[in-house]
């Protein structure tokens, strides 16, 4: 079964909720570092601070991550696969030392953040839609890393 129109709509609506509140970007990185403190050095905007501090670079990176998952949902609905548009994405992830467990941490942080952003609209169906879209993106990035 492919990515459904309803799943795409769920990702779209919760993506809009995420974008409305910049504090969700801080929450996203706070969850990542709680789960994987050593990942701090992978992010230039975090490595010199004692804790997660809001900044334009943090906001931009969080929006890029969530935006790419959102775009993955659109691609999955349209063609059934995710193609990474940025040819350097695989190389950047290799350079930063990203390995499979990091993708799991980011997925968990993404889902927890979307759950918070969605509030009472959160459901298993919404979670599954984001999870499938994220897995599509993660697979495309891993492919670009090889």
Swiss-Prot record:
The modification Phosphoserine is found at residue 44. The modification Nitrated tyrosine is found at residues 24, 29, 134. The keyword Protein biosynthesis does not apply. Belongs to the plant globin family. One of its GO terms (biological process) is response to abscisic acid. InterPro entries: Globin (IPR000971), Globin-like_sf (IPR009050), Globin/Proto (IPR012292), Leghaemoglobin-like (IPR001032), Leghaemoglobin_Fe_BS (IPR019824). SUPFAM superfamilies: Globin-like. Nitrated in effective nodules and particularly in hypoxic conditions; this mechanism may play a protective role in the symbiosis by buffering toxic peroxynitrite NO(2)(-). Nitration level decrease during nodule senescence. Phosphorylation at Ser-44 disrupts the molecular environment of its porphyrin ring oxygen binding pocket, thus leading to a reduced oxygen consumption and to the delivery of oxygen O(2) to symbiosomes. This is Leghemoglobin Lb120-1. Residues 2-146 form the Globin domain. Its main location: cytoplasm. Pfam families: Globin. GO terms for molecular function: heme binding; metal ion binding; oxygen binding; oxygen carrier activity. Monomer. Leghemoglobin that reversibly binds oxygen O(2) through a pentacoordinated heme iron. In root nodules, facilitates the diffusion of oxygen to the bacteroids while preventing the bacterial nitrogenase from being inactivated by buffering dioxygen, nitric oxide and carbon monoxide, and promoting the formation of reactive oxygen species (ROS, e.g. H(2)O(2)). This role is essential for symbiotic nitrogen fixation (SNF). It is found in: Cytoplasm, Cytosol; Nucleus. One of its GO terms (cellular component) is cytosol. O2 binds at residue 61. Heme b binds at residues 44, 64, 93, 96. Root nodules. It comes from Pisum sativum. Keywords: Cytoplasm, Heme, Iron, Metal-binding, Nitration, Nitrogen fixation, Nodulation, Nucleus, Oxygen transport, Phosphoprotein, Transport. Induction: Strongly reduced levels in boron-deficient nodules. Inhibited by abscisic acid (ABA) in parallel with lower nitrogen fixation in nodules.
């Amino acid at each position: 079964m492919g990515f459904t129109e309803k799943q795409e709509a769920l990702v779209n609506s919760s993506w809009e909720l995420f974008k409305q509140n910049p504090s969700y970007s801080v929450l996203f990185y706070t969850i990542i570092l709680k789960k994987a403190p050593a990942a701090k050095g992978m992010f230039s905007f975090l490595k010199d601070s004692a804790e997660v501090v809001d900044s334009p670079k943090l906001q931009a990176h969080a929006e890029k991550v969530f935006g790419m998952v959102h775009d993955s949902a659109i691609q999955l609905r349209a063609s059934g696969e995710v193609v990474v548009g940025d040819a350097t994405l695989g190389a950047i992830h290799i350079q930063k030392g990203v390995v499979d467990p990091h993708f799991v941490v980011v997925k968990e942080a993404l889902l927890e953040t979307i759950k918070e952003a969605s509030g009472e609209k959160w459901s298993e169906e919404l979670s599954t839609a984001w999870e499938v879209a994220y897995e599509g993106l993660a697979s495309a990035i891993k492919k670009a890393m090889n």
